[in-house]
Amino acid sequence: MQTHEIRRRFLDHFVKAGHTEVPSASLILDDPNLLFVNAGMVQFVPFFLGQQTPPYPRATSVQKCVRTLDIENVGITTRHNTFFQMAGNFSFGDYFKRDAIKHAWALLTSSVDDGGYGFDPERIWVTVYLDDDDARDIWRDEVGVPESRIQRRGMADNYWSMGIPGPCGPCSEIYYDRGPEYGKEGGPEADEDRYIEIWNLVFMQNERGLGISKDNFEILGPLPKQNIDTGMGVERVAFLLQGVDNVYETDLVRPVIAKAEELSGRKYGAVHDDDVRFRVIADHARTAAMLIADGVNPGNDGRGYVLRRLLRRIVRSAKLLGADKPSMREFITVVRDTMAPSYPVLDTDFGRIETVAVGEETAFLKTLTSGSKLFEGAAESVKASGKSTIGGDQAFALHDTYGFPIDLTLEMAAEAGLTVDEEGFRTLMAEQRQRAKDDAQARKHAHADLTVYKELLDRGPTEFTGFHELVSEAHVLALISQGQRVPVATAGQDVEVILDRSPLYAEAGGQIADLGTLTGPGLRVKVNDVQKIAKKLWVHKVTVQEGQLTEGDVVLAQVDAAWRKGATQGHSGTHMVHAALRQVLGPNAVQAGSLNKPGYLRFDFSWQGALTEAQKQDIEVVANEAVAADYSVNTFVTDLDKAKSMGAMALFGENYGDEVRVVEIGGPFSMELCGGTHVGSSSQIGNVTLLGEQSVGSGVRRVEAYVGLDSYRYLAKERALLAGLSSSLKVPSEEVPARVEALVERLRVAEKELEQTRAQAVLAAAGTFVDKAQRVGPVLLVADSAPAGVGGNDLRGLVTDIRGRFGTQPAVVALLGDVDGKVPFVVAVNKAAQELGLAAGDLVKGFGPKIGGRGGGKADMAQGSGSDTSGIAAALDAVRGQVADKVGSQ
């Protein structure tokens, strides 16, 4: 029975039993705590937790799942897979144990003709929780499974919970006995290689309390509603019904291995190490294709890094199998052909899937070739010294120089029988990050001695008051000039000022610093920039305009209100654009960087390939609809875990403290961890106008936008431009695009006609040159200056035409042009002249130096260019001389 039919029979069985068929959820849910969907019940969690009312009392689905915790074990055994399909039936307070058990038994044991799978009931074993007599009684007394094939297990095996307080309950697992050739007797307790688990029935009947482990937590009591959550492994059922030993030999996976056999010339099942690589390719190609289809792009962290790792393992496995050319396209194509009947997106979106996968392959092949040589040298050196550990410095060099991720180095080391000093590697990585931070600080502070800032940090952080006020009274704690503390600064001096408190925003999180002033009696100081030291100390870079600023002064620190308003519009606009991107493109459009300043924003995000015009328009519409909705903007401080559980967006790789600030715009529309300043409501952002979109690196795109008055000014210019075009073209503005397109087409046709006319005029001169041909021995020679301004393809075409007019007579044509002070030249020698020993390439070498140039080519045609027009006559004489020397006596 084919896998597609297994899926279909499952769904049909439960639809007939009153269940609503629900499509598989995306592998990517908008949940910061879940890397990938890894179970069939994930999309139904809000129903099980009582957070939402289910629209149906019972449901069935086949959910695509990805688990990557044991990715390094994939291929080594036949039991590990990263991608699998979980078929399930679910009841939300409707039926319970009896119906769940009977539904499963009916589907498994009914004949194929009756819509079932036709499993032999005598080979089915079940397990139940230790004291779940209800389930035991149903299996034994109502279904008819003898007690000898029912085993009781404890909480670790047969009691389910989500790992946190919430629904929980006993479960009953269904196993199939493959026979004595696969292991010893005794049921699942004795041998889970022989007895394969195919279905797990979870009876959610209790509420879990706190606990410290999977099998040690408090059960608080019964739930008000009892639910059912089951999961049947589609691939496991497939290999049992197809009579093969494991998932890798089923109809959906074996074709990928077959393609790898074809490309490598090796056979699956012959050599263990090769088999590992075949299985890695087969598993990872399926997973990678499904992840890309759901919007994941290769990246350096989070989901993107998992995808990158999968693709790179495919590339390396193919190379180790001996594939002599890139193979990713071939593997992805097989995945499409086998799985698209169940997942049509693999077909409809194949172009993008292929582009992403092949792009990563192309980039990694360069890294793999160069990095592998360094690794092999390091491994040989370690073995030669009698040691077994590759040093952290060597692993760091692989990462730093060749981009080798540490997991690849670990994998290669294990294959070579070696280990890696991971602690040493991570120490060097930490040192590199610290150096980068120090360098950044040094650049911001003109490479000053940071000791002075450390002394000030030890006295405590700057109090930032700018969230609540734009003017604050502050004490001048220190003045710094060229890295040294100074007691006073006078008019005209540029210094750095440290205050005990400040309303001026220090550059951070993509938002540039506030502008403002420091004032006092007879004192006016312009604040040009504000930077942070160690995220705690505000360093104000200022120019003293009037008076004298002294350490210990009390000043009024004031933000430029217009500047701040524009900056908050830009920053809040960035959040709106981020939310709109994710709404249009999906949750994988994750922030990779940003810049916000008054009236303008720039946002970098992870994405593969250019956005379409329709996507850009949709993003702009979504953002402006949110602006028009006048959403309230709320900020609050909470702990990091709670913020993430609420769905707040956090940047991968960013270090957050225990407490974080959350900026929420319109409830669920946008919620991000952010320390920046923002508007009070979304309508204060004003219009959002996207300016364009471009690539800024591998897998990273950038959008730019104007907001507020800058957006209106931009649109006013665009409107004026359109009005001008409308007036010039004498058509209504809505007809301008069509009229411009028509004019461009007319111009294209005219240019083509002009080019044809010009080419014909050039070729018309061919007859004149033929008439002027000189006879040198048996050869007809044209050695002359080309018509004025003729060069490039025109010159080549003219020379070719002249040569052709001589027919079978031996002929040499050499024309030199004069175009903008350059001397293009082309020499053509026909076959008859070549038989006399003449070659175009030899001729250009002879006369090239006369015009300060060089050229090259083959015997029939050669060309080049010189820079000395005064040497044209001498060069032509040289051509005549070379031909005469070669054939003059013949």
From Swiss-Prot:
It catalyses: tRNA(Ala) + L-alanine + ATP = L-alanyl-tRNA(Ala) + AMP + diphosphate. GO terms for molecular function: alanine-tRNA ligase activity; aminoacyl-tRNA deacylase activity; ATP binding; tRNA binding; zinc ion binding. It is an enzyme of class 6 (ligase). The keyword Nucleotide-binding applies. Keywords: Aminoacyl-tRNA synthetase, ATP-binding, Cytoplasm, Ligase, Metal-binding, Nucleotide-binding, Protein biosynthesis, RNA-binding, tRNA-binding, Zinc. The keyword Ligase applies. Its EC number is 6.1.1.7. Zn(2+) binds at residues 571, 575, 674, 678. It holds the Pfam family DHHA1. Signal peptide: none annotated. The gene is alaS. It comes from the Bacteria. SUPFAM superfamilies: Class II aaRS and biotin synthetases, Putative anticodon-binding domain of alanyl-tRNA synthetase (AlaRS), ThrRS/AlaRS common domain, Translation proteins. Its cofactor is Zn(2+). InterPro entries: aa-tRNA-synth_II/BPL/LPL (IPR045864), Ala-tRNA-lgiase_IIc (IPR002318), Ala-tRNA-ligase_IIc_anticod-bd (IPR018162), Ala-tRNA-synth_IIc_core (IPR018165), Ala-tRNA-synth_IIc_N (IPR018164), Ala-tRNA_ligase (IPR050058), Ala_tRNA_ligase_euk/bac (IPR023033), DHHA1_dom (IPR003156). Binds 1 zinc ion per subunit. Catalyzes the attachment of alanine to tRNA(Ala) in a two-step reaction: alanine is first activated by ATP to form Ala-AMP and then transferred to the acceptor end of tRNA(Ala). Also edits incorrectly charged Ser-tRNA(Ala) and Gly-tRNA(Ala) via its editing domain. This is Alanine--tRNA ligase. HAMAP family: Ala_tRNA_synth_B (MF_00036_B). One of its GO terms (biological process) is alanyl-tRNA aminoacylation. It is found in: Cytoplasm. Belongs to the class-II aminoacyl-tRNA synthetase family.
